[in-house]
A protein has these predicted regions:
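Core, highly hydrophobic multi-pass alpha-helical transmembrane subunits of bioenergetic inner membranes
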Residues: 1-171
Length: 171
């Protein structure tokens, strides 16, 4: 998934260069390039409909690895999202953001595995960030930093007390 998303980022830049002569990814103006870049960032962040890989990967990894995937591995795509926010397709980004916020919250309610709950929480939070970036890119960065801090605290606490399921948390 990540390799395909990286390929889409490069493809969007190449298509933009063919049509406009501009290779700078922060200066995309060709509509197809903007659409591809928006989809690629959605894939990298795990936004709906490109979210299917994220809960399964988090569930299959240790809490420490899941922490890194939920926070540190989101820094590069969030940076690209911030730098290219003016070039992204607003309709596609808004659609993915609203769907991520709704589906992340809804699917998280149906889980008993802690890592899957946190994965769907991450999808929902990233949906909120994708909505915010349209109006205030700097506020999105602040939101992401706070999300990373809170998520790190939760993952490290769960790792310390060795919780894997909600049922073991109550005992």
């Amino acid at each position: 998934v990540q390799a395909a998303a990286s390929t889409l980022v490069l493809l969007s830049s190449m298509i933009n260069a063919w049509h406009t002569g501009q290779w700078d990814i922060t200066q995309l103006t060709y509509p197809i390039s903007c659409l591809l870049l928006t989809a690629a960032i959605g894939m990298k962040l795990g936004l709906v409909p490109f979210h299917f890989w994220f809960p399964e990967v988090l569930q299959g990894s240790s809490l420490t690895t899941a922490l890194l995937l939920s926070t540190m591995m989101k820094f590069p795509p969030i940076t690209i999202l911030f730098m290219t926010s003016h070039s992204l397709n607003p309709m596609l980004l808004t659609s993915m953001a609203i769907a991520s916020t709704a589906l992340g919250g809804w699917m998280g309610l149906n889980q008993t595995q802690v890592r899957k709950i946190l994965a769907f929480s991450s999808i929902s939070h990233l949906g909120w960030m994708a909505i915010i970036i349209i109006y205030s890119p700097k506020l999105t960065l602040l939101t992401f930093y706070l999300y990373s801090l809170m998520t790190s605290t939760v993952f490290l606490s769960l790792n310390t007390i060795k919780v894997m399921k909600l049922s073991t948390m109550m005992t």
